A protein has these predicted regions:
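Active-site anion/phosphate-binding pocket segments in diverse small-molecule metabolic enzymes
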Residues: 2-21, 73, 92, 99, ...
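Active-site-proximal beta-alpha core segment in soluble small-molecule metabolic enzymes
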Residues: 2-7, 11-15, 19-22, 29, ...
Length: 400
């Protein structure tokens, strides 16, 4: 693995699996006993790497399973021998129905045509396939409405001979705000709807769930049979308005590079495209081989910083597709080959995803998701490299 780390000197995301487990334990201790956790690992675990993170959770009894965005994401997990339940949180397209039933992947259902297509295919395959029903209580995205038509939909789903209505859920749109009035309204609407459906059909849903990360932290009454942990799994806060004393989170992601060139220039020299920065004194400049093609955004031009030898170095000029420059005049000891911390800790300095997200006009988890496929991920357990994910090693080109 030492050779691998040297191979990834240009840029590398370090993923701390111990931090993932720490964050899970914090959530488990915070929620009610018996409440399960669904680990939301869609979008390749918010850019962190879904498969190795799922491997870490496979034997945890309080982790019910995983939430993903598509059947393709679910199949990536199944192909990696992940056996816990997987819920596709969004719409599933008809081409995938046989696959998801065969691979025991649970779809979210909120359309009658989908309901009956799944029932017909499951019957043809001679299996009973679980589904979760999505209820729209205020997100206005997908889901049945919590009204009489919605009650009729649930009744229709329960009548499908080849489907098992395992769960029902909704999603908060404002749980990360200080004012929880809207979120509490969603919760009450959802609970009333679930109660009505259960009473009218003499049925008990196995999994009733609505809490996202903000709900887990701030809304204990919403932590029902299961919670869906996304952003906090990776040590990032849903917003500045949630109670940060409720749980202790450890950031999972660090981003590292190395200096490839150091030069001294006089005052009056323009730096990078369009000369948006001009040196005002003799300046020592270091070039870092990372750019917006790696997910390090152009918005950090002339505003962001990195850490070298435990000291901050400001970005000067525009971030290019593959490189950017920093002012290291105040770090005279730095040299070519020295490590550069783009995200994470070096000495007493720490750059968070939240900081870079704010500077670049992104949410913290948006920033993490945009770290590109050119950036390899190395996964650490107990401080030692455990495995790596490298797009250039894994890619297979198929002719169509």
């Amino acid at each position: 693995m030492i050779n691998r780390l040297e191979q990834y000197s240009r840029v590398c995301a370090h993923i701390n699996l111990d931090a993932v487990l720490h964050n899970l334990e914090q959530m488990h201790a915070h929620i009610s006993e018996g409440t399960k956790i669904m680990a939301v690992i869609k979008a390749d675990a918010y850019g962190h790497g879904a498969v190795p993170i799922a491997w870490e959770m496979e034997e945890l009894s309080y982790v019910y399973g995983y939430g993903v965005a598509s059947v393709e994401e679910a199949m990536q997990l199944r192909n990696a021998n992940i056996r816990k339940p997987i819920l596709v949180l969004g719409y599933t397209f008809p081409y995938s129905y046989e696959t998801l039933i065969n691979q025991e992947i649970t779809p979210t259902v909120f359309r009658r045509d989908v309901l009956h297509q799944l029932d017909e295919i499951a019957g043809r395959m001679n299996v009973k396939s679980p589904i979760h029903i999505k209820v729209d209580t205020g997100m206005t995205r997908i889901g049945i409405r919590p009204d009489e038509e919605g009650v009729a939909f649930v009744k229709e789903a329960l009548a499908c001979e080849n489907l098992i209505v395992e769960g029902i859920f909704t999603h908060f749109s404002k749980a990360d705000e200080a004012d929880k009035a809207f979120a509490n309204g969603q919760l009450q609407s959802f609970l009333s709807f679930v109660k009505k459906c259960e009473e009218e059909n003499d049925y008990k849903f196995k999994l009733v769930h609505c809490s996202n990360s903000a709900g887990i932290i701030d809304m204990p009454d919403a932590n029902l049979d299961m919670v869906r942990a996304g952003i906090i799994l990776y040590g990032m806060w849903p917003s500045e308005d949630v109670d940060k004393n409720a749980v202790d989170l450890e950031p999972v992601l660090s981003l590292k590079s190395h200096i490839v060139y150091v030069k001294d220039v006089e005052a009056g020299i323009p730096v990078s495209y369009n000369g948006t920065y001009i040196t005002d004194r003799t300046t020592r400049i270091a070039t870092i081989p990372v750019g917006y093609a790696d997910g390090y955004p152009r918005n950090l031009s002339n505003t962001g910083t990195v850490i070298i030898a435990g000291k901050r170095a400001p970005i000067i000029g525009r971030v290019c597709m593959d490189q950017f420059m920093v002012d290291v005049t105040g770090i005279p000891e730095c040299k070519e080959g020295d490590e550069v911390t783009l995200i994470g800790r070096d000495g007493d300095e720490y750059i968070t995803v939240e900081e870079l997200g704010t500077i670049s006009g992104r949410f913290n988890y948006e920033f993490a998701c945009e770290i590109g496929k050119r950036t390899p991920r190395v996964f650490f357990r107990h401080g030692k490299a455990f495995c790596a994910k490298d797009y250039y090693d894994d890619v297979k080109i198929k002719k169509i």
